[in-house]
Amino acid sequence: MSRYRGPRFKKIRRLGALPGLTRKRPRSGSDLRNQSRSGKRSQYRIRLEEKQKLRFHYGLTERQLLRYVRIAGKAKGSTGQVLLQLLEMRLDNILFRLGMASTIPGARQLVNHRHILVNGRIVDIPSYRCKPQDIITTRDEQRSRALIQNYMDSSPHEELAKHLSLYSSQYKGLVNQIIDIKWIGLKINELLVVEYYSRQT
C-alpha cells in the first residue's frame, strides 16, 4: 500500500488530530459525531483506526509500518514503546519536531531534495534513524536556509521536547537523547497497534 496523498482533512475528521500530516484540526462537531459512533465500533475497527492514525501521522506505507513493528518486537522492552521511539527518531520526524518543517511530508521533501545534513554530511533518506548527539543542519546555501526559515516562521512556537535542542539562528538542531514516551506529539494507544498486527499473523 502506497503512502497516503489524498485529502488530509478527511483523515483528521475520522481519526482526530494528526499534526504530522497537517496543522489543521477537526471541528469540534466532527469530534462529537465520531464519539457518538464509537459505541458501534468493533474491537477490530478500534485497533485498525489506531494503526491508521500512526501510519498517517508519520507518513508511512503499510509495508514500512509493518517492518517497524517487527523490528520493535525483536527489541528489549515494550514493543509499543520501542515502536514509537523508532518512528520518533526518524530524520523527517526530527525535523518536524524541531520546527524546521511544518509537517512530516514537508520534512521528507527537504531531505529528498538534499537540503539537510547530519553531522556535516548530506542525508537524503527520510527514514534515517537519528541517534543521541546527532547534529542536524541545513546546507550552507541561500535557498536551503530560506526554505527552513520560512518553515520556522510559519510553524507554531510550541515547547520543544526535551530530547531535542534547536539553535534557530544557526539553522541547527541537536538530538540530546532517545525520546521518552511522554514527549510523543501524538495521542495514540500504541498497544492497540501492536495488537492489530499480532492478530494479522
Swiss-Prot record:
Domain of life: Eukaryota
Listed Pfam families: Ribosomal_S4, S4
GO MF entries: rRNA binding; structural constituent of ribosome
Cited PANTHER family: 30S 40S RIBOSOMAL PROTEIN (PTHR11831), SMALL RIBOSOMAL SUBUNIT PROTEIN US4M (PTHR11831:SF4)
Official protein name in the record: Small ribosomal subunit protein uS4c
InterPro entries on file: Ribosomal_uS4, Ribosomal_uS4_bac-type, Ribosomal_uS4_CS, Ribosomal_uS4_N, S4_RNA-bd, S4_RNA-bd_sf
Primary location recorded for the protein, binned into one broad class: plastid
SUPFAM superfamilies: Alpha-L RNA-binding motif (SSF55174)
Organism: Drimys granadensis
Functional note: One of the primary rRNA binding proteins, it binds directly to 16S rRNA where it nucleates assembly of the body of the 30S subunit.
Family: Belongs to the universal ribosomal protein uS4 family.
NCBIfam families: PRK05327.1, rpsD_bact
CDD domains associated with the record: S4
GO cellular component: chloroplast; small ribosomal subunit
Region (Disordered): 15-43
GO biological process terms, semicolon-separated: ribosomal small subunit biogenesis; translation
Domain S4 RNA-binding residue range list: 89-150
Protein location: Plastid, Chloroplast
PROSITE patterns, sorted: RIBOSOMAL_S4 (PS00632), S4 (PS50889)
Subunit structure: Part of the 30S ribosomal subunit. Contacts protein S5. The interaction surface between S4 and S5 is involved in control of translational fidelity.
Gene3D superfamilies attached to this UniProt entry: Ribosomal Protein S4 Delta 41, Chain A, domain 1, RNA-binding S4 domain
Assigned keywords, A-Z: Chloroplast, Plastid, Ribonucleoprotein, Ribosomal protein, RNA-binding, rRNA-binding
Gene name per UniProt: rps4
